[in-house]
Amino acid sequence: MAELLLGVNIDHIATLRNARGTDYPDPVQAAFIAEQAGADGITVHLREDRRHITDRDVRILRQTLHTRMNLEMAVTEEMLAIAVETRPHFCCLVPEKRQEVTTEGGLDVAGQRDKMRDACARLAAAGIQVSLFIDADERQINAAAEVGAPFIEIHTGCYANAETDAEQAKELARIASAATLAARLGLKVNAGHGLTYHNVKAIAALPEMHELNIGHAIIGRAVMTGLKEAVAEMKRLMLEARG
């Protein structure tokens, strides 16, 4: 069974800061608190429209984090250049649409193998480990292995948004099957999107899971209980699921 890690996404600390155009709350300070509370890594999504995390945030976080930076980004020339210059520990390549509220669905790796292969090779040459954010789909998992990504991150949105227990169980089975296939192909398996304190345990219990990236639920809880307590509680639930 893989060791289970928690990556805390701090995008919405920046969302709150940018809502008033101030310099607070500071994502760098939030990252430090999250690390102290047990986060194994810090995830940030540098979007093309810079709606929350900024280039400056990325630079400072890379210099100050005590754990690992996971930079989520679209597969564009601009973002690849920023990643190669900044050299985060991990890059998670995601699809991106300007009009979306949050990332909707996974990358179509199978439909753009050459582009993904080139991006993975370029990032790997800079010493960056690459993850591809994909749906729990056999075709996409096979394609991820073919293009040379060492990690995938399974999109858990359909599981998280399921309206009935039966629908959620079906999505969980799909994720479990996808994780098993990925591990068999030599891929390390992460997961994220829509995971909360109420639904995380079933995903955390899957033996192939290496890291869960969780943001909105933790920041939402932090408003009520404080960030340190919110991160620690999520980590406790994840480890509890592993027995």
Curated annotation (Swiss-Prot):
CDD domains: PNPsynthase
Binding locations of 3-amino-2-oxopropyl phosphate: 9, 20, 194, 215-216
Role, per record: Catalyzes the complicated ring closure reaction between the two acyclic compounds 1-deoxy-D-xylulose-5-phosphate (DXP) and 3-amino-2-oxopropyl phosphate (1-amino-acetone-3-phosphate or AAP) to form pyridoxine 5'-phosphate (PNP) and inorganic phosphate.
Binding site for 1-deoxy-D-xylulose 5-phosphate: 11-12, 47, 52, 102
UniProt EC number: 2.6.99.2
Pathway assigned to this chain's UniProt record: Cofactor biosynthesis; pyridoxine 5'-phosphate biosynthesis; pyridoxine 5'-phosphate from D-erythrose 4-phosphate: step 5/5
Name of the protein described by the UniProt record: Pyridoxine 5'-phosphate synthase
Entry annotation: catalytic residues: 45, 72, 193
Subunit structure as annotated in this protein's UniProt entry: Homooctamer; tetramer of dimers.
Organism expressing this protein natively: Salmonella typhi
Site (Transition state stabilizer): 153
